[in-house]
């Protein structure tokens, strides 16, 4: 349920399975439904295939072999890794003539009295308010076992995000989710200081829209 209070009155629905989607409109008591008009200026029909059992939200096993299920590294990397893992979400959004997949991270700030859902992603994913408004995020979209891939319970948030900033040079973008983060999500800490050469680094992401994965390497100074 969402109040359409935006100036443009637009609302992007969550992605749903099947060929039909039902939309219910709730009006205040005493308000006639006669003048209400609904338009669908854009539709995104996500194609599925037999490999994914014709389910649009799977994409299981689509990533490269250097990525392992995020749950596999919990014992090795500990609590800090688990917190960072729980801050990462799968993304779908509409841009130009298609729907795309990316990864984003929920960020913390220094105000301990609030939990503002700052959301960091890539500039090449979202670089305008028009695209940010179409954002859906998928939380805890990961395997419940190390092997085989087994999609557990996840939460989908719709309603989009407010676009705050992006930079093509750094390929970064900052958004603010219009819905609060779901239960179980974490707010990731961050540090703007440069990494030392050969520092171990870990990428927690949804490559090719796959389940949450982690890959590892070392920081290399560009020359």
Please give the residue ranges for each predicted region.
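Serine endopeptidase catalytic core focused on the charge-relay Asp
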Residues: 15-223
